[in-house]
Amino acid sequence: MARTVFCRKLQKEADGLDFQLYPGELGKRIFDNISKEAWGEWQKKQTMLINEHKLNMMEPNARAFLEEKMSAYLFDDVEPTIEGYVPPEK
C-alpha cells in the first residue's frame, strides 16, 4: 500500500514519496510533507530553471540557487520566474 501524506504544496492527501530524494533536513521535510505529484511538478520547474539559467549543477552556487527556489516553491507557494513561460490555466 502506498504511503500517503498531507501535501503542503497541493493542500490535500496524496501519495507520498517512496524514499527521501533530497539530503539533509530539507530532504526530510520534503519526504514528510510533499507528495509524488507535487515533486513531479517541481522537477519540471527545476529543468526549466536549469536550462534558462544555464546552470552547471557541479557548481555550489547553482545548487544553492535551485535549493532556494525549490524550498520557496514547495513550502511558500512561490512560483519561480521563468522567462517566456506561461503556466496553463487550471
From Swiss-Prot:
InterPro entries linked: Fe_traffick_prot_YggX, Fe_traffick_prot_YggX_sf
Keywords assigned by UniProt, alphabetized: Iron
A biological-process GO annotation: cellular response to oxidative stress
Superkingdom of origin organism: Bacteria
Gene Ontology CC terms, in alphabetical order: cytosol
Annotated signal peptide: none
Keyword DNA repair: no
Molecular-function GO terms, alphabetical: iron ion binding
HAMAP family in UniProt: Fe_traffic_YggX (MF_00686)
Family classification: Belongs to the Fe(2+)-trafficking protein family.
Protein function: Could be a mediator in iron transactions between iron acquisition and iron-requiring processes, such as synthesis and/or repair of Fe-S clusters in biosynthetic enzymes.
Protein name (database record): Probable Fe(2+)-trafficking protein
Annotated source species: Alteromonas mediterranea (strain DSM 17117 / CIP 110805 / LMG 28347 / Deep ecotype)
